[in-house]
Curated annotation (Swiss-Prot):
UniProt-annotated location(s): Cytoplasm
GO cellular component, one term: cytosol
InterPro entries membership: DNA/RNA_pol_sf, DNA_pol_Y-fam_lit_finger_sf, DNA_pol_Y-fam_little_finger, DNA_polymerase-Y, DNApol_IV, IMS_HHH_1, Rev_trsase/Diguanyl_cyclase, UmuC
Keyword set includes Amino-acid biosynthesis: no
Keywords assigned: Cytoplasm, DNA damage, DNA repair, DNA replication, DNA-binding, DNA-directed DNA polymerase, Magnesium, Metal-binding, Mutator protein, Nucleotidyltransferase, Plasmid, Transferase
Subunit structure: Monomer.
UniProt name for this protein: DNA polymerase IV 2
Cofactor binding, per record: Binds 2 magnesium ions per subunit.
Positions bearing the site annotation: Substrate discrimination: 13
GO biological process: DNA-templated DNA replication; error-prone translesion synthesis; SOS response
Record PROSITE patterns: UMUC
Source organism per UniProt: Rhizobium meliloti (strain 1021) (Ensifer meliloti)
Active site, UniProt feature: 103
Amino acid sequence: MRKIIHIDMDAFYASVEQRDNPELRGKPVAVGYPEARGVVAAASYEARKFGVHSAMPSVTAKRKCPELIFVPHRFDVYRAVSRQIQAIFAEYTPLVEPLSLDEAYLDVTENFRGLKLATEIAEEIRGRIRAETHLTASAGVSYNKFLAKMASDQRKPDGLFVITPKHGPDFVQALPVKKFHGVGPATAEKMKRLGIETGADLKSRDLAFLQQHFGKSGPYFYWIARGIDERKVKPDRIRKSIGAEDTFREDVHDLETARAGLKPLIDKVWHYCEASGIRGKTMTLKVKWADFTQITRSKTIVAPIASVAEMSEIAELLLSPIFPAPKGIRLLGVTLSSLDTVDDRSEPQLALAL
């Protein structure tokens, strides 16, 4: 049985800003820009109480929270703090799989400290993060990656939650599927239409049913409904692409609706690019039709895509020619590949595509 920890920094970007500027502490803070095209990169817990969250348009966030304070992002600082945190992880285990600047999986079944309890390691790490960075982290401890991820959400912020092998299956059965890692809003809505609202409902469906309705994701849903996840923690995972996709609630037939659906996907991918200091030269558009067949269209440029506006322009070049669409569009996705890193000197604004 493996011992897995999922560490998730609490409102990471916003917490760094509040740490470095005492005047922001205790106030609703959004990292991003307040302009009409701006997007919230991160929100403090004070802002989240008003319904503000990451990837929300700035104008919407300001409407929800008139007292919201916007601060420009400092991704060079966030990356530096992330490196501090990664250094702490490395003192306990070589099996660290970073998911982003602010979260990671650790396999501590065998660890450098010779500690038998993963909970003890998680508490040590949380304490060191607090002492060395003056930030808080939440941790989930369990026997696989899925449950460790679910556990870290249970006591946020600044908490620890453990899911043991004895309690794992019951925990999953009681959990709403919309809270499952890997189940997005569109998938949760589809599950609801199929009468699946809890882990118990999901477990009651056989593998053939889940494969019929969810394709390649079917086996994943089948096993996590039973508290089983065999994925290993993969250290130094080399990312070959950055992508985002979404399923429409109703099939899309017109270009304007497709454009509107593509905008948040472009923003999500660009947000990751800015946060990680990565850029890509090849952009791929994925279109899944109503009959589940799909096509992809790609464009490669000489220099890495340098802005969200440029990314939007390329997306338009790929999207427009498929209209008038021969059939309804079920899903759109956008991916950047041919990746490379950039230095910290140029950080364009996180913004919504025009």
